[in-house]
Amino acid sequence: MSRYTDISYEGTSYTVNTGLDIKDFQIEEDWYNRPASEWSVKRIGQLQGKVEQYTYRIYHSNKYGKHNLARLIPGHVLISFANECFGYDGWSSEVEEITSLEHTENAASEDKRESHTVLAEARVKLVLKDDTYTFAGGFGKSTMPFKGEAFAKAKKEAITDALKNCLLGFEKVILDHEIKIKQNYYVDGVFKAEMSKIEGKTSIPRTVR
């Protein structure tokens, strides 16, 4: 049973192909892009409420036209919202990958000094305390007088962008979750597509989601 849910796997049968031993496989819960508990459903809803209130104010300022308003929320504001909704110790993030995609050296001119432009990409994993988690990518671009400074700033912006995408992406997680509930997609806490409970049918068990 999950630490934060009432889902039980008692009575669930697992089978494997002939010649394989099920004991050789490790079955574990995986809550990627799926709320692991009512706690995360509620707290993600609170986060979305704060995002909507913030973008509502931007919209009525008539300054940005038809832009994706959520993208205009500063990273530090979203992080503050996350701390308020999930708690300071209720979520964490980890940089899975960061790459410099492009580096351009800009030659000096009469009115400009030499500079460096760097484009970076990052992939961040965000985990809530009930094991709900998601991944997202982000980009950062910076032009600075020195190459090292340009690389550092571009990577920092890429990480911030990826983290923002994680937090903003929770809206889709909840919407997909609600649709699956209405469609009776979940069976005893596992996805229908990954587990078979038909007697006599064999399959290699994958990660339980």
UniProtKB/Swiss-Prot annotation:
Keyword annotations from UniProtKB, A to Z: DNA damage, DNA recombination, DNA repair, Nucleus
Gene3D superfamilies per record: DNA repair protein Rad52/59/22
Keyword DNA repair: yes
Acetylation recorded as keyword: no
Pfam families reported for this sequence: Rad52_Rad22
Main location: nucleus
Compartment annotation: Nucleus
GO cellular component assignments: nucleus
One GO process term, biological-process aspect: mitotic recombination
Oligomer and partners: Interacts with RAD51 and RAD52.
Family: Belongs to the RAD52 family.
Cited function: Involved in the repair of double-strand breaks in DNA during vegetative growth via recombination and single-strand annealing. Anneals complementary single-stranded DNA.
Protein's recorded name: DNA repair protein RAD59
Organism: Kluyveromyces lactis (strain ATCC 8585 / CBS 2359 / DSM 70799 / NBRC 1267 / NRRL Y-1140 / WM37)
Gene from which the chain derives: RAD59
